[in-house]
């Protein structure tokens, strides 16, 4: 198992904190976010880590492979992810946003999740959003499951709070078969490569999943049918 940290974007929501550093080097609890992420990944047994940089990417140094998205200011997360296409082809990879913190046990749970693509979401998201925003609905995105455990909505703004069953937290796993689905989608619609973020990518399919309770977080494996592209 390998890991890819997507750290190309400016992190504009962090405002002045990223004026002189990439968002993954902003400090929390006495050390950079990137250090927390590497610690969690290593704690879950992942030794091979790749960081895709962009904005101030020359500042990224550490016990990892560094790649650069030269179009970081014109593209979104999918383009940064595909900078590490060879890693995705070679083995299942944990994909991490660069502006989040998580424990090793969350990564470990994700490693065990079934499916070609798997991700974690937070069922207790509302407590955190209430602390961050006067109006949690202004930032929250849709995340709904049907009675059979299938994702029916993800990543849409402006939905009623009572309909949201969790929030995707920026940590997922993609297998080589999951990459095949992504590439099949892009073969049909190559213009999506530059503009899709991760939730928009996932929202372009309907898929089955299995739910795995993990304290505040749930892990679920996405059983993607590569023959059925719903766009």
What are these regions (language model features)?
Residues 1-3, 154-155, 160-231:
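Conserved alpha/beta core of the MobA/IspD/sugar-nucleotide pyrophosphorylase nucleotidyltransferase superfamily
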Residues 57, 103-104, 226:
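Short, well-ordered alpha-helical microsegments
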Residues 62, 104-185:
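Conserved core of the sugar-phosphate nucleotidyltransferase
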Residues 72-76, 126-128, 218-221:
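A short acidic, often aromatic-flanked loop/helix-cap motif at beta-alpha or helix-coil junctions
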């Amino acid at each position: 198992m390998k890991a890819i940290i997507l750290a190309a974007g400016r992190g504009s929501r962090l405002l002045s904190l990223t004026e002189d550093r990439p968002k993954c080097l902003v400090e929390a609890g006495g050390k950079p976010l990137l250090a927390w992420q590497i610690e969690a990944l290593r704690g879950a047994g992942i030794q091979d880590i790749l960081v895709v940089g962009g904005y101030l990417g020359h500042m990224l140094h550490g016990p990892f492979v560094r790649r650069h998205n030269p179009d970081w200011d014109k593209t979104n997360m999918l383009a940064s992810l595909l900078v590490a296409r060879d890693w995705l082809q070679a083995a299942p990879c944990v994909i991490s946003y660069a502006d989040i913190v998580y424990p090793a046990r969350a990564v470990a749970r994700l490693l065990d999740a079934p499916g070609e693509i798997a991700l974690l979401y937070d069922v207790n998201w509302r407590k955190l959003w209430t602390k961050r925003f006067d109006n949690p609905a202004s930032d929250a995105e849709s995340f709904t499951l049907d009675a059979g455990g299938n994702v029916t909505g993800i990543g849409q703004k402006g939905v009623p709070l009572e309909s949201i069953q969790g929030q995707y937290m920026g940590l997922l796993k993609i297998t080589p078969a999951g990459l095949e689905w992504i590439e099949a989608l892009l073969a049909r619609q190559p213009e999506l490569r530059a503009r899709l973020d991760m939730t928009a990518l996932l929202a372009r399919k309907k898929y089955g999943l299995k739910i795995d309770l993990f304290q505040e977080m749930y892990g679920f494996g996405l059983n993607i049918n590569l023959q059925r592209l719903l766009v």
